[in-house]
């Protein structure tokens, strides 16, 4: 049956654009910047983020369900994404270059988290780098690894302060 493969491609395509919007639309970046603020990438970094940032993939799941894909298949994609996120953020130095144009690797995703000028608007894909290749956001320099992580903005320390950070200019009377 081809439906799971079509669903997978549609899911990945939707997550690519949602993720890209989180970087390119300033109000969304306010939330997503917390995930990118870590200056040392490791598997725990995959869990660092504002709760609203978790809605990043919601459109992809809603799209799958609306398109008639089963809840089971949608759940499999959800679990796969969490597990892959742990792997992609891991502090590993594996040379998986032959795979970079076929599947996302930790090195590919580390470039996405890099705060180096040439890498900032790149590598949004979740599973398949084809979307970055098609839309001009693929970045994998040869024989070089990211040296600088984090963001230019000052993100406060502490969970409460990070929860409030994206809302700081919205006139919230509670703080």
What are these regions (language model features)?
Residues 146-175:
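A membrane-cytosol interface segment of integral membrane proteins
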Residues 1-147:
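Membrane-embedded catalytic scaffold of the fatty acid hydroxylase/desaturase
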